């Protein structure tokens, strides 16, 4: 089944409570934790993640875009998010990070990989991974378009992982390019403006979910 995880950072930060109220019919909420060092932006911190978790029953997936992901393992486990990943580029020992999340009870654990990082950097962790996030825009490029070079990386990962690992694509995905993303081998996408930039975010999410599920069915992966 196709999964859609709208990114809360694309909603109005001045009215985050109102945005959160409008997400209650979603199946996932994506939270970017950016520290201003690994990437230039600063988004949500652990206090905000904890506040969101206390005020919604929607499963939360957290994408750590930080220099020291190990520092976030304990808080994430205490908060009880549903899924968490960090960038392979920021992890000297990715296996240690993944094992720590697993021991802490995080349901889904993963790695993220930047646009220009070779896909080979993640392939050896297949036995520990539940999912991989492929960042499909240039780093620090909020709002820039999807980069098609991501598709070949997803294809290679799907060939290597088979069906064992869920493949997510994050950045610039919309209703137009989603079929290409699914055909390349992705099962899930993170979107921002494609949902929260619309007049009716829930209706937009439902349209994207239908496109994704229809494409998976055509590919024989429903």
Residue positions per predicted region:
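Conserved N-terminal beta1-alpha1 strand-loop-helix module at the mouth
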Residues: 1-85, 91-93, 109, 117, ...
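Conserved functional loop/turn residues at catalytic and ligand-binding sites
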Residues: 80, 105, 185, 190
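Active-site/ligand-binding-proximal alpha/beta "capping" segment
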Residues: 133-183, 187-188, 194
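Generic C-terminal helix-cap and adjacent flexible tail
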Residues: 210-222
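Short acidic, glycine/proline-enriched helix-loop-strand junctions
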Residues: 96, 103-108, 217
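A generic structural signal for well-ordered alpha-helical segments
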Residues: 53, 101-102
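Short glycine/serine/threonine-biased micro-segments
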Residues: 34, 43, 108, 141, ...
């Amino acid at each position: 089944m196709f999964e859609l995880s709208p990114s809360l950072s694309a909603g109005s930060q001045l009215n985050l409570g109102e945005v959160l109220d409008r997400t209650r019919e979603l199946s996932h909420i994506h939270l970017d934790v950016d520290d201003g060092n690994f990437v230039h932006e600063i988004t949500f911190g652990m206090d905000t993640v904890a506040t969101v978790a206390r005020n919604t029953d929607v499963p939360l997936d957290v994408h750590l875009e930080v220099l020291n992901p190990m520092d976030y393992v304990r808080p994430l486990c205490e908060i009880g998010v549903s899924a968490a990943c960090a960038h392979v580029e920021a992890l000297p020992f990715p296996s240690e990070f993944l094992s720590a999340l697993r021991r802490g009870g995080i349901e889904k654990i993963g790695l993220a990989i930047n646009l220009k990082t070779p896909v080979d950097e993640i392939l050896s962790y297949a036995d520990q991974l539940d999912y991989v996030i492929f960042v499909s825009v240039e780093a620090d490029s909020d709002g820039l378009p999807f980069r098609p070079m991501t598709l070949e990386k997803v294809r290679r990962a799907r060939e290597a992982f088979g069906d064992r690992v869920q493949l997510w694509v994050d950045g610039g995905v919309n209703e137009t390019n989603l079929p290409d993303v699914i055909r390349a081998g992705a099962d899930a996408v993170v979107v921002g403006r494609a949902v929260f930039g619309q007049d009716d975010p829930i209706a937009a999410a439902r349209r994207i979910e239908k496109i994704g599920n229809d494409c998976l069915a055509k590919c024989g992966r429903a």
